[in-house]
Amino acid sequence: MTLRSKILVNKNVLPTAEQALPGRETPMALPETHFVNGNPLLGPFSSNVEFAIFGLGCFWGAERRLWQQEGVVSTVVGYAGGFTPNPTYEEVCSGLTAHTEVVLVVYEPEKISYKSLLKVFWEAHNPTQGMRQGNDIGTQYRSVIYCTTPKQLDAAKASAAEFQAELRKAGLGAITTEIEEAPTVYFAEAYHQQYLAKNPQGYCGLGGTGVCLPA
């Protein structure tokens, strides 16, 4: 407990696997359909869909921005990139899971390209802030792109280089976004799913830099 107590003081420090909370085997129970569009939340989907995973701060606002895009079939919020299996929201907020808040996006590539989703991602938040996003501070708010295919990984890295060049022109700092192969996504509790559609006056800390990714 000494090690965990020390980490709790500084939520900008990722715990090791040994320090992380143990979690549980049982995943969160989720509704069958998306609250906004009525599509299946987790499938079955048609064979032409693809999957993308983004973390850009608090997942409430991030999910709304992504479900608003034409061609997006479903969105699910969850936790990824850490050690604790099937964590609770409170556990993630403790800083003792190493997870960040993410949105799993199910999309039709003939209607919206992965590059277009990357443009939404970069422009919707500030990817230079490390373990925070605006006033939201902690490892669970770090910026990430978790890629489900090698093609996505190449595209994400290329877009990061493009956006970094634009940030420098604007006098902004270095991108801290993690760009990696997709780890396991543990879905968040049902009340977090499509939260801002259920609670239109709810908190949304999403905010970009004003810098645009070239088309």
From Swiss-Prot:
This enzyme's EC code(s): 1.8.4.11
One cellular component (GO) term of this entry: cytoplasm
Residues spanning the signal sequence: none
GO molecular function: L-methionine-(S)-S-oxide reductase activity; peptide-methionine (S)-S-oxide reductase activity
Active-site residues per Swiss-Prot or TrEMBL entry: C58
Pfam families assigned to the protein according to its UniProt record, in alphabetical order: PMSR
Keyword vocabulary terms for this entry: Oxidoreductase
Reactions listed under catalytic activity: L-methionyl-[protein] + [thioredoxin]-disulfide + H2O = L-methionyl-(S)-S-oxide-[protein] + [thioredoxin]-dithiol; [thioredoxin]-disulfide + L-methionine + H2O = L-methionine (S)-S-oxide + [thioredoxin]-dithiol
SUPFAM superfamilies, A to Z: Peptide methionine sulfoxide reductase
InterPro entries reported in the protein's UniProt record: Met_Sox_Rdtase_MsrA_dom, Met_Sox_Rdtase_MsrA_sf, MsrA_MetSO_reductase
Similarity field: Belongs to the MsrA Met sulfoxide reductase family.
HAMAP family: MsrA
Function field: Has an important function as a repair enzyme for proteins that have been inactivated by oxidation. Catalyzes the reversible oxidation-reduction of methionine sulfoxide in proteins to methionine.
Protein name stated in the entry: Peptide methionine sulfoxide reductase MsrA
Species: Pseudomonas savastanoi pv. phaseolicola (strain 1448A / Race 6) (Pseudomonas syringae pv. phaseolicola (strain 1448A / Race 6))
